[in-house]
Curated annotation (Swiss-Prot):
Name of this chain's protein: Cytoskeleton protein RodZ
Domain HTH cro/C1-type span(s) in chain numbering: 19-71
Chief location category: membrane
Annotated TM spans: 112-132
Cellular component GO terms held in the UniProt record: plasma membrane
One Gene Ontology term of the molecular function aspect: DNA binding
Cytoplasmic side: 1-111
Family of this protein: Belongs to the RodZ family.
Gene of this entry: rodZ
PANTHER family: CYTOSKELETON PROTEIN RODZ (PTHR34475:SF1), PTHR34475
Gene Ontology BP annotations: regulation of cell shape
Swiss-Prot/TrEMBL domain comment: The helix-turn-helix (HTH) motif in the cytoplasmic domain of the N-terminus is involved in the formation of spirals to maintain the rigid rod shape. As this protein is anchored in the cytoplasmic membrane, the HTH motif may contribute to protein-protein interactions to form the RodZ helix, which is localized beneath the cytoplasmic membrane. The C-terminal domain may be critical for determination of the rod shape by probably interacting with enzymes required for synthesis of the peptidoglycan layer, including PBPs in the periplasm.
Biased composition (Polar residues): 155-169, 203-217
Record-linked InterPro entries: Bact_Cytoskel_RodZ, Cro/C1-type_HTH, Lambda_DNA-bd_dom_sf, RodZ, RodZ-like_C
Amino acid sequence: MNTEATHDQNEALTTGVRLRNAREQLGLSQQAVAERLCLKVSTVRDIEEDKAPADLASTFLRGYIRSYARLVHIPEEELLPGLEKQAPLRAAKVAPMQSFSLGKRRKKRDGWLMTFTWLVLFVVIGLSGAWWWQDHKAQQEEITTMADQSSAELNANGTNSQSIPLENSTTTVPEATPAPAAPVDTTANEQTPAASTPAPVTEPQQNAVVPPSQANVDTATTAPAAPATTTTPDTATPLPTDQAGVTTPAADPNALVMNFTADCWLEVTDATGKKLFSGMQRKDGNLNLTGQAPYKLKIGAPAAVQIQYQGKPVDLSRFIRTNQVARLTLNAEQSPAQ
């Protein structure tokens, strides 16, 4: 009767209560049980309170309970009915397998998307390259056109400058011929032959004076010796006065100074529309131009030229960065505007 009563009493107790009573009879604490079973104290507490943690699989929970029972010397057969209630076996949720055709369809769709993306990228790159090439080609054609125009203007100016000396020579020849206008002086030459001796004295003066003075020299040679001495200082006096009248022009405050580090095409126009320079300037060349401000400049290679206006450098960095033909205007206050 006593054994049957104790058996019925044990069945009435839950698994957790039986394990806790057995632990207390052995004088073990929850910390000691957790260290021996290599479990957390919270897990031992949940087992004794008949709790099944949601994050713990039932298979692991049943294994922990069996290890706990062996530790406190409780037969596993006595705990099996309680285990079925406390930690029932739960069927694992198996995710439905995706068909191979679905994955293949998705992969095919991703492949089309990547192909379209690469196609758009190539089109954008191609359009950008074509735009850059057209812009670069247009700049090169513009530079070539300006260079051809400047060469044509230089050739035209060269032909005009060559024709001018020929016209001057033809006009000056008749001016030198009126020398026979002194037939009256021949009688003086016959009467005073000694008057021809001062001629060597007047020869250096003939080299330094203009052709109209030659007539004065001829008349001086035909005069007597005494007047000849008085005319020599008169003919010599214009020389120092002409030299003193020649003065070097003062430096123009609006002068435009340019130094070239490479070959560069250039065109400079002043306020009156006069082209001060138009053509190709070579490396290590220098230009010093003066005119009426403001100046309009066209520079084919801005990186190859250094400009000083009113003693201050002109900033061309914005044209150098974009690598394009520089078009700017230099005002009297040195404010370059595109």
